[in-house]
Amino acid sequence: MRVAFGGPLFRKKMEHLVKVKDYIPDIRVDLKYASEDNFTGHKIYDFTEAYLRYGTVQKLMKVQEALRKQGLSLKIWDAYRPPSAQFVFWEICPDDTYIANPIKGFSPHSRGGAVDITLVDRTGKELEMPTEYDDFSGKAVRDYPGWTPQAAANQRIVEQLMVDNGFVAYEGEWWHYVDTDKYEVVEEAEVLK
């Protein structure tokens, strides 16, 4: 039996939630919400691995490959986010500029199609970027004029590669990218079984 590229079986595979490191072993992962090192000050996740949709990981692989040639790498700060975490975030910071209101609809993170990233060198050292992660100020906005030239250049490297490979850059957070393919919300129990 032959399956046409883009047919229903192909689409099903692209929708699977997978562990990112199984496909991109050299990518760095530091899930901020799996520790207390985040804007809440609390550990939110019960897992430390980054999960994304298979189709999203395929796009991220191309970005990582291009960075690898430059002696650089992506570092993931957040990927799949359980819907329950979205409610916790909203309770702490009920501002839809920064946090998707779970009553109105879940973040693309809860669909496995969004990733928060930064740039590191081959040793894993973070390069200068515009702000710290989860900086809820105007300095994190993509067109903020006060970034240092080096931070702006590093951010542009990531943004150009991400956009060229099928992601949309969120204007309010320089680190946040959403896959152009749309997915349904994934319940935590479906991921961590």
PLM feature spans:
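Extracytoplasmic cell-surface/polysaccharide-interacting catalytic and binding patches
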Residues: 5-79, 89-172, 178-193
